[in-house]
């Protein structure tokens, strides 16, 4: 019975061990979408601009509070020394009483030259601008994650090609050594094969170093080690048909342009706000007070007021007019920044489009080159085996094929990255991956508001 239990436990343990690698592979596998999402959600740059957005949300709440009444309470008590006519009329030179007073005031805005309206309008625009800055930063960080992800895949493919190249050169060395031992070759061929093998091993070592650098970059950007990465594909329907369509989409949708547009709206509201200084300020002020034992009198006083109060500055040294001119220049500055951003986004989009086209053409050219080199290598190998081709020609053909395959892999991943770079320039990288932007990137997220928040 004991032997049976022991055998059963061993079988279960063996099954668990066999299943563990499969589970581990599934747990460690990461898609491009997951890598970008992790990078955006954990990157402190995104956190920084998101917190700036939340701070401006609170400034918007402060602006909306200007429409609401302001209520203040005041209470005070303490000894009061009095020597006045009232005290003397009572036949005393002076008197000290414990003065007690309390008051409540309510002030309600009636008209302030549209200052509050402009403040709310400005803060809504600033919230919109901050939200687009969050989205812009998310797109940039997402593109960094895409680049680091593709770099790891590219260098892994290059390592595989370099390892195959080393294996081929080892086979060539074994072949010429066997010939030399059989008396059908010479020592020069052996030395040449050894030298080429060393060169192939050196190339492999260099590519492995490049892979480690790419993995280090991935860890910095994504925050996790790149274990099993899945090859991504760009959906065909998300890439515009031509460069001008791409530029138009970028200028319309790029978060870089959108936050500049919002900055212009904020600047316009600033100008309106400064104009409020040319108008009177009108408020309803309600007040009530209770005072006990004041001015030497042992009695209690009650007061209540309901006033409409107007305040109107007549002269401030020309500061108001100068401030209006200042903010008009600020508005013009914001418009110029918008034009600068539009031009920069258009340039980035055209550069990305050109990179995509060039890399696509390179892929086609290099595929033909690889195919031609494979055919050449195969012919040279057959000729070498029957003594019609020298070893050096075959080794050169092997090397040309290795270099062409390495260049093709680089071109393929360069083309893939160029597509994602184009999407990022249009502000649609996250959408193309099926990702929802973080909450702080939504300009409408602050619309729900309560005066008691």
Question: What are the language-model segments listed below?
Answer:
Residues 207, 255, 411:
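Metallo-beta-lactamase
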Residues 31, 70-84, 89-137, 258-341, ...:
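Small/polar-residue-enriched beta-strand and adjacent coil segments characteristic
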Residues 48-63, 137, 141-162, 171, ...:
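Amphipathic alpha-helical coiled-coil segments
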Residues 2-23:
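Gram-negative bacterial Sec-dependent N-terminal signal peptides
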Residues 24-76, 82, 109-110, 225-265, ...:
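Bacterial Sec-pathway N-terminal export signals of envelope proteins
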Residues 2-3, 10, 30, 138-249, ...:
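Periplasmic alpha-helical coiled-coil/stalk elements that build and connect Gram-negative outer-membrane
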Residues 2-6, 25-26, 81, 407-453:
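Acidic, low-complexity, intrinsically disordered peripheral segments
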């Amino acid at each position: 019975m004991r032997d049976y239990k022991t055998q059963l436990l061993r079988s279960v343990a063996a099954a668990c061990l066999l299943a563990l690698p499969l589970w581990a592979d599934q747990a460690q596998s990461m898609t491009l979408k997951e890598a970008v999402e992790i990078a955006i959600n954990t990157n402190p740059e995104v956190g920084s601009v998101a917190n700036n957005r939340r701070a401006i949300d609170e400034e918007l709440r402060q602006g909306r509070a200007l429409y609401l009444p302001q209520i203040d309470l005041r209470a005070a008590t303490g000894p009061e020394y009095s020597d006045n006519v009232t005290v003397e009329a009572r036949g005393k030179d002076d008197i000290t009483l414990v003065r007690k007073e309390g008051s409540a005031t309510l002030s309600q805005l009636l008209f302030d030259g549209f200052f509050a309206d402009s403040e709310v309008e400005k803060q809504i625009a600033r919230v919109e601008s901050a939200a687009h800055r969050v989205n812009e930063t998310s797109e940039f960080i997402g593109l960094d994650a895409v680049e680091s992800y593709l770099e790891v895949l590219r260098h892994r493919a290059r390592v595989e090609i370099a390892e195959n190249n080393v294996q081929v050169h080892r086979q060539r060395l074994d072949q010429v050594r066997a010939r030399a031992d059989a008396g059908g070759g010479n020592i020069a061929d052996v030395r040449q094969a050894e030298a080429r093998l060393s060169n192939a091993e050196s190339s492999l070592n260099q590519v492995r170093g490049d892979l480690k650098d790419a993995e280090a970059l991935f860890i910095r950007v994504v925050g996790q080690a790149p274990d099993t990465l899945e090859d991504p594909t760009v959906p065909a329907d998300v890439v515009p048909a031509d460069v001008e369509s791409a530029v138009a989409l970028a200028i319309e949708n790029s978060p870089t342009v959108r936050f500049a547009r919002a900055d212009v709206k904020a600047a316009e509201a600033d100008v309106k706000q400064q104009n409020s200084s040319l108008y009177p300020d009108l408020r309803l002020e309600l007040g009530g007070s209770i005072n006990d034992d004041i001015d030497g009198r042992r009695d209690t006083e009650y007061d209540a007021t309901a006033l409409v109060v107007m305040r109107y500055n007549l002269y401030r040294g020309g500061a108001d007019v100068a401030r209006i001119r200042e903010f008009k220049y600020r508005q013009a500055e914001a418009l110029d920044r918008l034009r600068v951003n539009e031009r920069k986004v258009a340039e980035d989009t055209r550069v990305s489009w050109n990179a995509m086209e060039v890399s696509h053409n390179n892929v086609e050219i290099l595929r033909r080159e690889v195919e031609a080199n494979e055919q050449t290598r195969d012919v040279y190998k057959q000729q070498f085996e029957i003594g019609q081709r020298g070893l050096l020609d075959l080794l050169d053909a092997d090397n040309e094929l290795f270099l062409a395959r390495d260049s093709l892999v680089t071109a393929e991943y360069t083309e893939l990255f160029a597509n994602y770079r184009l999407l990022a320039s249009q502000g649609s990288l996250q959408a193309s991956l099926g990702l929802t932007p973080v909450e702080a990137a939504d300009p409408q997220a602050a619309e729900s508001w309560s005066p008691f928040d």
